[in-house]
Swiss-Prot record:
Motif window: GXSXG: 332-336
Catalytic activity, EC: 3.1.1.-
Transmembrane segments: 126-146
Native source species: Cryptococcus neoformans var. neoformans serotype D (strain JEC21 / ATCC MYA-565) (Filobasidiella neoformans)
Protein name listed in UniProt: Patatin-like phospholipase domain-containing protein CNE02340
Keywords from the named record: Hydrolase, Lipid degradation, Lipid metabolism, Membrane, Transmembrane, Transmembrane helix
Amino acid sequence: MPPSPPSSAAADQWNIDYVNEDHLKAFAQALSYNDVQPLDGDSSPLSPRSFSLPPESPQLSTASVKAPPPTWKYGPDNGTLRSGRDTEERVEKLTATSDFAPIHQRVSRKRQRATSQGLTYNVIRWPLLFFIFFIIYLEFSAYVITRQIVNIFEWLVAWRGYKAKLRKELRKAKTYDEWVNTAKKLDKHLGFDDWKDVEEDSYFDWALVRRVRRTLTRLRAANDTRGLMDALAVCVRANFAGTESVKMYSETFIGTKKAVEAHIKEVAACLDYVRTATDVSLEEKRAFFRAVNKHYGSSALCLSGGASFGYYHFGVIKAFLEADLLPRVITGTSAGGLCAALLCTRTDSELKELLVPELADKITACSDPFTVWFKRFRQTGARFDTIDWARRSMWFTRGSLTFKEAYTKTGRALNISVVPSDRHSPTILLNHLTAPNCLIWSAILASAAVPGILNPVVLMAKDRSGNIKPHNLGGSRFKDGSLREDIPLGSLHTQFNCNFSIVSQTNPHIHLFFFAPRGSVGRPVAHRKGKGWRGGFILSALESYIKLDLSKHFKVIRDLDLMPQILQSDWSGVFLQRFSGDLTLTPRSTIGDWFHILSDPDRPQMKRMLRVGERVAWPALGMVRNRMTVERAILRGRSEVRTALSHDRTSNDPATSLPETNPELTGALDHVPIESDVDAGFVSRSRRARNKTGSKGGDTPEEQLNLAGVFQLDESSKGVRRRKQKKSGMPLVAEPLGELPEVSPTHSPIATESPQRNYTSNFGDSFRHVRAPSLPALSSPFRSIRSNTSSSSNNVQSPSSSQRFRSQLSITRWFGGVSESSSDEEDEDLGGLQSGEATASSGEEGIPTFQLDSAVESHSDRSEDEMLHSGANVKEEYQSEESEGKIPIPGGERVTQEKIDSSMASGERLRPAGGSKGSAKTPPVQDGA
């Protein structure tokens, strides 16, 4: 189907000129400064402060312009030397950077002789290096031959007959729907559908997944929101029980086991149920979604370098865009940085208009003829001109946008990896957190500054006045980040909590070594029903052995420092860094791509690259969709709870999309920030706002009065207080509810602190409860420490508190993600109690426990000993409910904080259909039983 003609808005995108000549002049001046001889004052790029724009810039007044730095002239035609102290022009001698690159590089006059590393090193270094390279050459030849034998074996043995025909149709599919239909035919023909139906498998904990899914369904049917939150806190984790393992998606062409699909759908449905529940406060929801978001993490799309091979990334981006599965965190290096910049500076609607073959008309970086770039290479040591590349790249970055401005516009976090020109400086990941005011086009140039291709560049940034100045961040000049860290997974995990990485790998020197002997995502082994080895076990083992031995030789070269510096760069880590992620996509390149590795694509080539990139991404969409289903359910909860806390309203539709105030923009400020540290600022602002009004407890005096009347705490309790500034509290002994005491609007009751949780033991106890035959044992996985406490004779108890009960307090105290001094946690602790008759008894270490006599007792309110004692009754209860078919899966009502407060004040709670009063009649187990 031919593409539709571009709209008027799209036509404007193609014709807009984003070039800013003033910014280019400032960039040229920054490049002219000498790195070796530091200048005095604040005009040095090596100093913390940045120098001013050139005098001809209209953005600065003449009074603010600094004196120009001394001029450096070099070469045979530098003019006649003048003597005297008033000499303004200085002459500097030239020396070659290395024998491999005799370029015009300014160096200091006085060079200290380096200390020798020893006679043995100098004598053995070069013979050992040549010997290792000879071994590498032999092993690489053997590796190429092995791979070709594997291809011949699969062509002769594996892909024959009808499945070979289906495979050709799969590779020629033009749309995702065509690919899906052919993939289903292949799964049916090869018998992979039978593998999907069988629940048991050794690659994941199928028994645990089944029990968790059944438990979540029952808790959701019983309207036990807090029990559901407890269970979700355990199972909403990255790769829980192996459900996100690549092996689970490498046995079929499309999809995975039905048990895994059902588990993911149930988890997403439970998250939406918690989001729309009315029997928990908004503060509890906020703490819960923050905790599960921290455990589950976020996804990231990583675009590697690869010169002209990197344009395959556009096809991968298009496939994820059309499937609405683009992650919010995007990173790119070198050529991938250019693709990532286009992705993160345009909205979805704009990208759909730009990802067409006509995009090749805007890629003109390599358009200079041979005579021009060869002369430039002889003079400067680089094939391309930095200023010319800056001018051409401004269209992709939408002018001089900064990282922060791009994040504000699209909601996507752009990350560019760069390396300082110094050999021992660490890699720097530029984004809206580490370099918010840095210009994206300068970061792209720095990331593409491969030695010999482009000289190291200076990063540029906007100041408070909007002027362009050098950005000194860990160095003065930067170069290609793929030399050391092509895929910055460690920095992404630290800054954005990325636990799932999607890597599009196009580096030509790495692409050949990607080989999956047991199949990859959406590409199973064709013979032995997916259980065999590609090319047989012997060839697969030989391929793995040769590849590991090659890596060993490169590590020896790096560790012994045998590799000389070529073009002032260390190339020893080019083959030793990590180039893969949790899900790695390798577009299928051709031999012709090697001959155009530094050439611009035309429209036919761009059309082919877009199609190849889409086809390599289609098999992975099923795995990414399952991951994004849970991730976006968490994001919906966080987003709507934050909106409700600000505007006291939230949507109840589980299918509600993320809010967008401006239809033309993604509206990043309306979304929940990706980085988790921003929530700490949200809590801090809430605390400061309440301190200004003098309120330390409820938001209003009425709320404080209601909360104070629910229970009173005994001053004899010596438990640790959550609020350190509160050194005294209300009595602990419970009194009959009569006339509520008068409470000052500025006084708040003290919330007790739950016992310190030992997550090492509790996490194992949680799984023990999941495997228990009785359902309610799962409902409180974080309450297992109650078994460690025993009754004390000096505990103060009321007559009706002889039985031990666990309080159903705030979810905030069950996780460790919120500050202990947060006043919001106090409100959650107090707001989590239902009104009604409550009795308190102090347990060990002065920790009170509460008995809540509400209309219907939730299963999660019962102690674990009580659950084990009455497990048979609970089982019969649920079996009777299931047989009668009276377990509804409720939707959500419209939730507001006023409705939650009113339901809490009246003592109302949601009753599960079919009745669950029988569980309340079970006699509890006494202490010490």
